[in-house]
Regions:
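Conserved cytosolic headpiece of P-type ATPases
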Residues: 1-502, 509-510, 523, 538, ...
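Membrane-embedded alpha-helical transmembrane segments of multi-pass integral membrane proteins
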Residues: 34, 528, 558-561, 595
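Generic alpha-helical transmembrane segments
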Residues: 480, 525-526, 549-564
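Long hydrophobic segments that form regular secondary structure
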Residues: 534-543
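Transmembrane alpha-helix entry/boundary detector in multi-pass membrane proteins
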Residues: 544-548
Length: 649
């Protein structure tokens, strides 16, 4: 089952592209009409020979098409894909193997994380802390219950292979001087029922090779196994013993047996006889409490969905800082049985405050994801088993474990190579930073679009030739699309994004702060560029090729320095911070500067340029740099005001 829902980024970019496309096409048509009208009404084109008329009309058409090329963000999808691809490669170094490209950004929009307990919050290094025996006829039977009713192994170095819980039992047996391999060789397996999250127990029918005695061995969740046991073999204090173990964050396991003559498991008769109860410790990962706190401070709700008991899950939640005894109550946790029995309406009223879902089945996890999505949440969910595949598919972001099954990995969007919750928090930071970098790219592009459109409109009505040629526009477009995308995509993630709340699903990718910046910088560009054209028209009557070369170079270097404004947008630090380590960003700057120099010095008639003197280059570079210096001064002032407001609080 797949949700088939578009990602938040995809919806926003589609809407933005359509809006910009409509405006760009409308303005290009307007420019074409103005140019044709001026040619016929002002320049007397109607009386010119038809070959000249055709040439002028085609030239006007080419200018209009070039305007569409500049205004319409046809390179936006490619640029975003480039950003996502670069992020995928870099996230791999932080133990996040991105399997589906869109997941890079979607993690930044996540509002709820439904996480497993074992291995993700804990170390998955289980160790049997205590085994309480109950009326065993001999110790051999307990050893067989551990060794034969298991699919795990110990390697040559004594490390467990297979299920971690079963591996912990084998390690305990070895510490008790038991030989699990010899015990296995001493019995014949007649039938086996492997563990499943639905049954919550495992059963193996064995026959001893020496005595031909047959036993059905069972191990699993205490409440399931005890329900099948003879009450006479179950001591009254066992519930208190189990609860005491669980309150210490121990996983509990019950072992039972029954002598039988059956050849198949279903033929064996109940009730069983309780053999022992095991308490298994699985310590919390050291880095998890800080990661959970970081996610919670970022406005992300964390919910534990586990097959363990409520007491065990609650203690783990307490250790990682998710559960507060002074604030949280039974309303903040549910068992799988309660969850299954509740209606969707009841759950919708409760899941917002739910923190723990214990004794949960995979279908419970999928249902929880579906209900959270109905409430408008963007949900990330973890899973490592084959049965987790539906929930991984249905979630906005499915997170499989590096130690999980291939089915779970194929169904997921990201694989956590180290299985740790810390990597989930890191993925959120990457996703938010990626979204911010995409905003910076759009900010850069729309600022240039705004200035270019206004300059083109003004140039089309002025008594002068177009300030930029078609070839110059194409070079500007390369800067706006490919090079700027590379520069913004190369920026490293920033921890500051984890101090913000998740963005709203319906929020426009163009924020109010971006609109203010676009309007401010774009207006400055327009004033500078139109001021140059107006001054030349006033002083010389018609701009010379040298003056238009200066105009073209000024336009490009305004973009050059505006890259710093885009880099510093919402950065929380100076735009120059860390620039020495941003090799891609520096390379892009060098390519723009070198490319512009080559075009001006060698472009000739193709680019309508003439070589400039070093003094002219110095004036252009120096004066256009004021756009970056001014932007940095404004951002520094805002940061100081923000810090003052925080101190006042």
């Amino acid at each position: 089952v797949q949700s088939g829902e578009q990602t938040p980024l995809h919806r926003q970019l589609t809407r933005l592209s359509r809006q910009i496309g409509k405006v760009g096409i409308a303005l290009s048509v307007l420019i074409f009409v103005i140019l044709i009208g001026k040619a016929f009404l002002v320049e007397g084109l109607a009386d010119a020979p038809w070959p000249h008329v055709v040439r002028i009309v085609l030239n006007c058409f080419m200018v209009s098409v070039a305007m569409i090329v500049m205004a319409v963000p046809e390179g936006l999808p490619m640029s975003i894909t480039l950003s996502l691809a670069l992020s995928m490669r870099r996230m791999l170094k932080t133990n996040n193997l991105v399997r589906k490209m869109h997941a890079c950004e979607t993690m930044g929009a996540v509002t709820v994380i439904c996480t497993d307990k074992t291995g993700t919050l804990t170390q998955n290094r289980m160790r049997v802390q205590e085994i309480i025996r109950y009326g065993l006829p001999d110790e051999r039977l307990l050893g067989e219950s551990v060794a034969a009713n298991s699919t795990a192994f110990l390697d040559a170095d004594g490390r467990p292979l297979g299920n971690p819980t079963e591996g912990a039992l084998l390690e305990w047996l070895r510490r008790e001087n038991g030989d699990y391999a010899a015990l296995r060789e001493g019995v014949r397996i007649l039938d086996r029922l492997t563990f499943s999250t639905e049954r919550k127990y495992m059963a193996t029918l064995i026959e001893r090779c020496d005595t031909r005695e047959r036993f059905l061995l069972i191990k699993g969740a205490p409440e399931v196994v005890l329900a099948r046991c003879d009450a006479a073999t179950v001591p009254a204090e066992i519930q208190e013993q189990l609860l005491g173990m669980q309150r210490r964050a121990m996983r509990t396991l019950a072992l039972a047996y029954v002598p039988t003559n059956a050849s198949r498991i279903e033929e064996a008769e109940e009730p069983y006889r309780l053999a022992a109860v095991a308490a298994i410790a699985d310590p919390v990962r050291e880095e998890v409490p800080a990661a959970v706190a970081e996610c919670m401070s970022a406005g992300i709700a964390v919910k534990i969905v586990t097959g363990d008991t409520a007491a065990t899950a609650t203690e783990i939640a307490r250790q990682i800082g998710l559960w507060n005894d002074a604030e949280d109550t039974d309303r903040n946790r549910m068992t799988g049985v309660e969850f299954e029995a509740a209606s969707d309406e009841e759950l919708l009223a409760r899941i917002g405050s739910l923190k723990i879902l214990s004794r949960a089945r995979p279908l419970d996890k999928q249902r929880l994801v579906r209900l959270l999505q109905q409430q408008g949440e963007v949900v990330a969910v973890t899973g490592d088993g084959t049965n987790d595949a539906p929930a991984l598919n249905f979630a906005n972001v499915g997170l499989s474990m590096g130690s999980g099954t291939s089915v779970a990995k194929d169904a997921s969007d990201i694989t956590l190579l180290d299985d740790s919750f810390r990597s989930i928090a890191t993925a959120v930071m990457w996703g938010r930073s990626l979204y911010r970098n995409i905003q910076r790219f759009i900010l850069f592009q729309l600022t240039i679009n705004f200035a270019a459109i206004v300059v083109f409109l003004a140039g089309s009505v002025m008594e002068t030739e177009m300030p930029l040629t078609v070839t110059q526009i194409l070079w500007v477009n390369i800067i706006m699309d490919t090079l700027a995308a590379m520069a913004m995509a190369s920026l490293p993630p920033q921890h500051e994004v984890m101090r913000e709340r998740p963005r709203r699903r319906d929020a426009s990718i163009v924020s109010r702060a971006m609109v203010r910046t676009i309007a401010t910088c774009g207006s400055i560009f327009v004033v500078v560029l139109l001021g140059m054209l107006g001054w030349w028209l006033y002083t010389t009557g018609e701009p010379t090729v040298r003056q238009l070369t200066v105009f073209f170079t000024t336009f490009v270097f305004l973009q050059f320095w505006n890259l710093f404004n885009a880099k510093g947008f919402e950065a929380g630090c100076a735009a120059s911070h860390g620039i020495a380590h941003s090799r891609t960003f520096l390379t892009v700057l060098a390519l723009i500067a070198l490319g512009q120099w080559l075009i001006v010095e060698l472009g000739g008639e193709v680019f309508r340029t003439v070589p400039l003197s070093w003094q002219e280059w110095a004036w252009i570079v120096g004066l256009t740099s004021l756009i970056a210096l001014g932007g940095e001064a404004i951002r520094a002032l805002r940061r100081r005001q923000t810090c003052s407001c925080r101190d006042a609080r």
